[in-house]
């Protein structure tokens, strides 16, 4: 991937006083199951600092974090991780037996999130936000990434979030317009290239595990074997997921040295894996996110200063 210092801007912000487009800033939250509470902490800090991005990209749990961020709902994401996830209705063997899905995404992004629900998404505020939204899911039939936009969200219809968070094997695929989808991490776990291709000059990347942590693909390969007979293309995506993730993070580190990317990542997972329900670990990850976001605040401030000097 070759990225120029000033790529073509698609839909960047227009500065009328300068009669030119200003830099376009993107943010990516890669999710990571319940570790996504770290990203929730980062984005809550961004709201506190009134830090705004032009293109917001979410993968898996990161997509849910992004919608609350764009709606300006500070603190909304946190209870989904440290409170609701402990409920049987959210995730349980009971769900797996009754509904053939360990995670009841209809409960999470329907019952809880719809108007009148316990913790509704402010759809009107989300729709008013001038920022672009991208939600990444994986087409279960061909294994390709599907990049949903804000236009694919509707009041009380948050299926694209369900699609992006749908973990293969333990969940039935989420079907939208006849197409089955799985977690976006199968197709594009770190959509950095997509962000730059769509006009971003600089990108903030939120990871939910340490940058140097080497993940094994043994679990993915085992799950891919179970998925192979029904969704072979998705199974192949699962086999390649760790490689794709590592490759993209390595590229992000190169771009970080050039000042084009800011990586925000925890120094520890606090023992948290994708579906680990540990209240102490969740609280620590959220606190880490808010604290680590200080580096993002400084990076954005410096970038804005450089931009003003350049104009």
Predicted region positions:
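Patatin-like phospholipase
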Residues: 5-59, 67-311
